A protein has these predicted regions:
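Metal-dependent amide/peptide-bond hydrolase catalytic core
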Residues: 1-10, 17, 24, 55, ...
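Acidic/His- and Gly-rich active-site-bordering loop/insert found
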Residues: 2-116, 137-140
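A structural signal for isolated positions on well-ordered beta-strands in alpha/beta enzyme cores
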Residues: 61, 87, 146-148, 298
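Short glycine-aspartate micro-motif
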Residues: 85-87, 113, 174-178, 197-199, ...
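Acidic-glycine-rich active-site phosphate/pyrophosphate-binding loop
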Residues: 93-109, 177, 191-201, 323
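Phosphate-handling active-site elements
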Residues: 99, 109-111, 131-146, 230-240, ...
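Glycine/serine-rich anion-binding loops at beta->alpha junctions
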Residues: 112-126, 208
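Acidic/histidine-rich catalytic neighborhood of metal-dependent amide-processing enzymes
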Residues: 121-193, 393-395
Length: 395
């Protein structure tokens, strides 16, 4: 374990000397707005990051993913160094449309940062960048350090090849830290649920509700039965392996016409692929049984984010990072499995050591109340500089 007073003092001085620069960079990054569909603004964010990566001596590039999605921005320090890459990853897109900063501008107050995306997950990018900057200034050349951020994590990735590129860059690495925000309770995430979107379509028979009521087959009525039955698939126990939530419904045109069409969309969460198969089988059974004779229901899988499962390599990565944190008096309190899909799943799927929720701590993601704790920003920089110097723990 490399933990010397000399290195500790060097890191402390680096953070103190760069506090103003860190906040300025944080502000600039948050002010680069962009959500799914705002390709021009997201590209500006990617270019901003690429420029800054290059300014600190990283070899950097934008990688096009297609499908109308924003590019991946990546930079590598010490590309020719021996050993495998230590990767800091995540996303630079947010859920907030351009213009949100006018209503909720970046600010720091009472030890917290506020603004669109400060917690999810631009704070994690700031940590990653200043870790790389420190390692460059310290003359660290022991292993390659890669920053790798996608621009479509908060989006439906249909038509793009982001997932294939993540898997490509994840293969053969030393370890990856997904810099999504940490909970304020301090746990590192070692598992996340997968999420799958389904479209349910009911075909009925249109008719006039006054003149031909009995001839009609109300698609909305049939859908109402389907929704209740689909919701009931969710096990009632707390440690359930999957859940079904029908969250969108569309049907009908006017009140004086029995609708022949209704569609709904369901969100399915699951801890492993076996659980998804079990859940999906029950969903198909529900949709194949017509309550109203003469109606037909179709169930179609639309999009999937696979679960981040706790492999042996994930356990090894957690043990190593926890050892570093404990040695330096850090704030990692334990490990946690949580809801909400993430790209750590694709690192894990190719056998990589990977951890999630390694970034800044905060709360109220995806809302105007979102905030991040500044002390965790500096603590994160300190933690991962030490992690880099102790790269052998992750082998």
């Amino acid at each position: 374990m490399i933990f010397t007073k000399e290195l500790e003092e060097k890191i402390r001085k680096y953070i103190d000397d760069n506090r103003e620069l860190i906040i300025d960079f944080y502000r600039d990054l948050v002010n680069h707005e962009g959500k799914d569909g705002e390709i021009d603004n997201l590209r500006k964010t990617a270019s901003f990051l690429k420029k800054n990566f290059e300014l600190i001596g990283m070899s950097s590039e934008l990688i096009e993913v297609g499908g109308g999605h924003a590019p991946i921005v990546t930079g590598v320090l010490n590309p020719k160094a021996p050993g495998k890459e230590m990767v800091f990853t995540g996303h630079y897109d947010t859920v907030f449309p351009t213009g949100t900063k006018g209503k909720n501008p970046f600010k720091t107050e009472n030890g917290k940062a506020f603004g669109p995306g400060v917690c999810d997950m631009k704070g994690g990018i700031v940590i990653s960048f200043f870790v790389a900057k420190a390692l460059k200034e310290f003359g660290f050349k022991t292993c390659p350090i890669r920053l790798f951020f996608v621009g479509d994590e908060e989006a439906n990735r249909e038509g793009g090849n982001t997932i294939e590129l993540i898997k490509k860059y994840a293969s053969g690495i030393l370890v990856a830290f997904n810099m999504e925000n940490r909970n304020e309770s301090g746990e590192i995430c070692i598992a996340r649920q997968g999420v799958c979107e389904y479209k349910i379509t009911v075909k009925g028979v249109a008719a006039h509700p006054g003149k031909a009521f009995d001839e009609g087959r109300n698609a909305i009525e049939e859908m109402s039965h389907k929704i209740i039955a689909l919701q009931a698939i969710t096990p009632k126990r707390k440690n359930r392996q999957y859940s079904v939530s029908v969250d969108v419904i569309k049907g009908g045109i006017v009140t004086n016409a029995i609708p022949d069409h209704c569609e709904a969309y369901a969100d399915v969460r699951f801890w492993n692929m076996q659980a998804l198969e079990e859940c999906e089988s029950k969903m198909f059974k529900v949709c194949s049984d017509a309550i109203l004779e003469g109606t037909e229901t179709e169930l179609k899988r639309m999009d999937i984010l696979i679960p981040f499962e706790t492999t042996e390599n994930v356990r090894k990565a957690y043990k190593a990072l926890k050892e570093v944190s404990d040695a330096i008096g850090g704030t990692i309190t334990g490990s946690v499995a949580t809801g909400g899909a993430c790209d750590a799943a694709y690192f894990s799927s190719v056998g990589a050591k990977v951890l999630c929720q390694c970034g800044i701590t905060g709360a109220y993601n995806h809302s105007i109340r979102e905030y991040a704790r500044l002390d965790s920003l500096y603590e994160g920089i300190r933690l991962f500089i030490f992690a880099a110097y102790n790269f052998k723990l992750f082998e």
